[in-house]
Curated annotation (Swiss-Prot):
Listed GO MF terms: rRNA binding; structural constituent of ribosome
Keyword Ribonucleoprotein part of the UniProt annotation: yes
Function: One of two assembly initiator proteins, it binds directly to the 5'-end of the 23S rRNA, where it nucleates assembly of the 50S subunit. One of the proteins that surrounds the polypeptide exit tunnel on the outside of the subunit.
GO BP annotations listed: translation
Gene Ontology CC: ribonucleoprotein complex; ribosome
NCBIfam families xref list: rplX_bact
Family according to the record: Belongs to the universal ribosomal protein uL24 family.
Subunit structure: Part of the 50S ribosomal subunit.
Source superkingdom: Bacteria
PROSITE patterns reported for this sequence: RIBOSOMAL_L24 (PS01108)
First and last residue of the signal peptide: none
Gene assigned in the entry: rplX
A Pfam family hit: ribosomal_L24
Protein name: Large ribosomal subunit protein uL24
């Protein structure tokens, strides 16, 4: 299985596409599609039929669609910049992610 440097609840910035420059939180990582769902980014309108069994109303709804994982970059909380992510081990042997710009540990 593929390993991505982006995880759920990471703060990311979109670096390519129609929403370039927008910042959002990762809602879901889709490894089979090489994609991510980012909160309030890549919004589309869908015409939904009402489903009484699920108590779903019909109408036009707005929802997020997946972005390719290569079009987003992790944003460091410490330096507030889009950054590459590296891995290293702490003194107690735990593997952690860190910001390659400021060397701070990422959540």
């Amino acid at each position: 299985m593929k390993q991505f440097r982006i995880r759920k609840d990471d703060k990311v910035v979109v670096i390519a596409g129609k929403d370039k420059g927008k910042i959002g939180k990762v809602l879901k990582v889709l490894p089979k599609k090489d994609g991510v769902l980012v909160e309030k980014v890549n919004m589309v309108k869908r015409h939904m039929r009402a489903n009484p069994y699920r108590q779903q109303p019909g109408g036009i709804i707005e929802k997020e669609m997946p972005l390719d994982i290569s079009n987003v970059m992790v944003m460091c909380d410490a330096c507030a910049k889009a950054t590459k992510v590296g891995y290293r081990y702490t003194e107690d042997g735990k593997k952690v992610r860190f910001c390659k710009k400021c060397n701070e540990i990422i959540g």
